[in-house]
Design a protein with these regions (language model features):
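Terminal amphipathic alpha-helical/low-complexity segments used for targeting or macromolecular assembly
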Residues: 1-58, 176-187
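Short secondary-structure boundary/capping segments
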Residues: 5-6, 51, 121, 128, ...
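Short-chain dehydrogenase/reductase
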Residues: 11, 60, 136, 154, ...
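Arg/Lys-rich RNA-binding interfaces used to dock onto structured RNA substrates
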Residues: 49, 63-66
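Flexible, glycine/small-residue-enriched loop-and-beta-strand segment within the central core
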Residues: 65-75, 80-149, 174-187
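C-terminal/domain-terminus segments
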Residues: 152-164
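Acidic, glycine-centered active-site loop in nucleotide-sugar glycosyltransferases
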Residues: 165-167, 172-175
Length: 187
């Protein structure tokens, strides 16, 4: 039988107040507080590297970070985020190498049932977010549950990304749409 954690990361309905999940969330709150209070960026990145599911060696995240668990976040090499990054990781959030994230960006994997009786039962579920390499998100970008983005995607400030897109595109708007294709230079 699956644990509530196993159900959660698989995107199946789960009980968020399960004791294992509450303990994981409490640990995340403690690490989040330690990170957000740390003034030495080197020590701050050591907290992240020991906490998140996986990271590249080179990363920088400004403070005022908010997560659900942290352990379901996987960041590639050369990851940068400005202030106020929110990553609600009830399902895995995976971002490839060379990502630049503007201020006030949100990566949201949780979902709730549309039916009010189901929603009021307390069950929740989620969908993972997967983003390829060379992602650039302007300020205030929101990436919603279940989104997959290819390589070399640029999301303009304030974009709300509600569906998946392939490689080499510029996205903007609410909901986000392709406003430009990015020419690919030879390797």
């Amino acid at each position: 039988m699956k644990t509530e954690y196993q159900k959660m990361i698989a995107g199946e309905p789960y009980h968020p107040f399960d004791s294992e999940l509450r303990a994981l969330a409490q640990t995340a709150r403690q690490k989040q507080a330690a990170f957000n209070e740390e003034v030495d960026p080197v020590k701050g990145m050591e907290i992240i590297k020991g906490w998140f599911g996986s990271t590249g060696e080179k990363l920088y995240i400004n403070t005022r970070l908010m997560v659900d668990y942290g352990v379901n976040i996987h960041l590639g090499e050369n990851f940068y985020s400005n202030w106020n990054l929110t990553m609600l990781d009830v399902c895995p959030i995976t971002i490839g190498d060379n990502a630049m994230i503007g201020p006030n960006c949100q990566f949201l994997t949780p979902l709730h049932p549309l039916d009010p009786d189901e929603r009021n039962s307390g069950l929740e579920f989620g969908k993972p977010i997967t983003i390829g390499k060379n992602f650039w998100a302007g300020g205030g970008v929101i990436v919603l549950p279940g989104v997959t983005l290819g390589d070399n995607v640029v999301a303009g400030a304030g974009a709300v990304i509600t569906k998946s897109f392939g490689d080499n595109v510029v996205l903007a708007g609410n909901p986000a749409r392709v406003i430009k294709e990015i020419p690919v230079k030879g390797n």
